[in-house]
From Swiss-Prot:
Gene assigned in the entry: eda
SUPFAM superfamilies referenced in this protein's UniProt entry, alphabetically: Aldolase (SSF51569)
Gene source species: Haemophilus influenzae (strain ATCC 51907 / DSM 11121 / KW20 / Rd)
First-level EC class: lyase
Catalytic activity field: 2-dehydro-3-deoxy-6-phospho-D-gluconate = D-glyceraldehyde 3-phosphate + pyruvate
Keywords: Carbohydrate metabolism, Cytoplasm, Lyase, Schiff base
Location(s), subcellular: Cytoplasm
PROSITE patterns membership: ALDOLASE_KDPG_KHG_1, ALDOLASE_KDPG_KHG_2
Protein family per UniProt: Belongs to the KHG/KDPG aldolase family.
Binding residues for pyruvate: R49, T73, K133
InterPro entries from the UniProt entry: Aldlse_KDPG_KHG (IPR000887), Aldolase_TIM (IPR013785), KDPG/KHG_AS_1 (IPR031337), KDPG/KHG_AS_2 (IPR031338)
This protein's pathway: Carbohydrate acid metabolism; 2-dehydro-3-deoxy-D-gluconate degradation; D-glyceraldehyde 3-phosphate and pyruvate from 2-dehydro-3-deoxy-D-gluconate: step 2/2
EC numbers: 4.1.2.14
Name recorded for this polypeptide: 2-dehydro-3-deoxy-phosphogluconate aldolase
Principal place of residence: cytoplasm
């Protein structure tokens, strides 16, 4: 099924945390998804940082139709089309590229573009986008910066990513406009490469316990 942006936001609010995943081997997505689901997370942002991304999205969609799937680190029109044809529910970009936003809108493909300053936010709002990624979160001022931006831009719904961990995730989630945080520390590539599903499961449980 296809979700509207608002439906995606509602699901993200329930989940609170989005695993940001980089894979070298697409086949690793299935045991990883099983591990995530068993520990309470039925969401994955699969990043286009490797050529395995589209195949991983395709495999996950075919085998775990219950998962909310984001295609992350999408930088080109070709990746947008590939993400959609592979079965992603929405696109996440590190920055705001109006051409990419317009393409997603033309394809009726929800997009959460990256912003970290007023200019990018105003471009997003002008294009009808109020659900945004705040990236790189900590390097861009973190919680303090988000609170400052929400003064004039109170309509934003935000998914911060970058530098978030157990030490600060609750500070982010305490802000009502934050729908979920993106994180990679509990799905590190080295843990996936070594098939260390037990450790990933432990780390997922750890973060779930923190954000309950």
């Amino acid at each position: 099924m296809s979700y509207t942006t608002q439906q995606i936001i509602e699901k993200l609010r329930e989940l609170k945390i989005v695993p940001v995943i980089a894979l070298d081997n697409a086949d690793d997505i299935l045991p990883l998804a099983d591990t995530l689901a068993k520990n309470g997370l039925s969401v994955a942002e699969i990043t286009f940082r490797s050529e395995a991304a589209a195949d991983a999205i395709r495999l996950l969609r075919a085998n775990r139709p219950d998962f909310l799937i984001a295609a992350g680190t999408v930088l080109t029109a070709e990746q947008v089309v590939l993400a959609k044809s592979s079965g992603a529910d929405f696109v996440v970009t590190p920055g705001l590229n109006p051409k990419i936003v317009k393409l997603c809108q033309d394809l009726n493909f929800p997009i959460t573009p990256g912003v970290n300053n007023p200019m990018a936010i105003e471009i997003a709002l002008e294009m009808g986008i109020s659900a945004v990624k705040f990236f790189p979160a900590e390097a861009s001022g973190g919680v303090k910066m988000i609170k400052a931006l929400l003064g004039p831009y109170a309509q934003l719904q935000i998914m911060p990513t970058g530098g978030i961990g157990l030490h600060n995730i609750r500070d982010y989630l305490a802000i009502p406009n934050i729908v979920a945080c993106g994180g990679s520390w509990f799905v590190e590539k080295k843990l996936i490469q070594s098939n260390n599903w037990d450790e990933i499961g432990r780390l997922v449980r750890e973060v779930i316990d923190i954000i309950k």
